[in-house]
Amino acid sequence: MFKSYDYCLNLGGFANVSQEVNDVRLAYDICPVNTVLNFYANIKGLPYDDNGKIASQHPVNTKLLNELNALSFYDKRPPKSLGVEWVNHTILPIIESYNISTEEKIATFTEHCAQQIGKSLNNTKTSTNSLDVLVTGGGAFNGWLIDRISNHCNSKLHLPDDELI
């Protein structure tokens, strides 16, 4: 079923991507997603940012975005893996060092995710043709995040029906 896609992108607590190479599935983590976004949505009394409504209606803090994007993890070559410890010891302290609203933190981190995922998909591209990417996981329900990822990559994102997501 998944062989018709160049990549499978899972947007769960962390974004991870997998592909089949010589009948072997290779996978790696790209960045935190719902682990961080849900943390800040919970502060607002919400389980998550429903369809990216908060992120889409608030500004991105460019300074924070640049600091997040400059983290050395993003320069490592795959395979690479992330854990909640890295979020707690690296990501959250950076975000919390900014005196900005929770909504702005959500907007900025959503953009950070989109940029890192787009960069990762663009860097793995092996031909001049657009890649077909199957998107699954809870983050696939975040329309704003999907729009922002599409803005930062040359791949075609495919969202299956809700049951598969």
Describe every region a protein language model picked out.
Residues 99, 119-130:
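Phosphate/pyrophosphate-binding loops at sites that engage ATP/ADP/AMP, CoA/4′-phosphopantetheine
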Residues 1-6:
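Conserved phosphate-binding catalytic cores of ATP/NTP-utilizing and phosphoryl-transfer enzymes
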Residues 26-114:
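Conserved ATP-utilizing enzyme core subdomain
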Residues 13, 138-140, 162:
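Active-site metal-binding loops of divalent metal-dependent hydrolases
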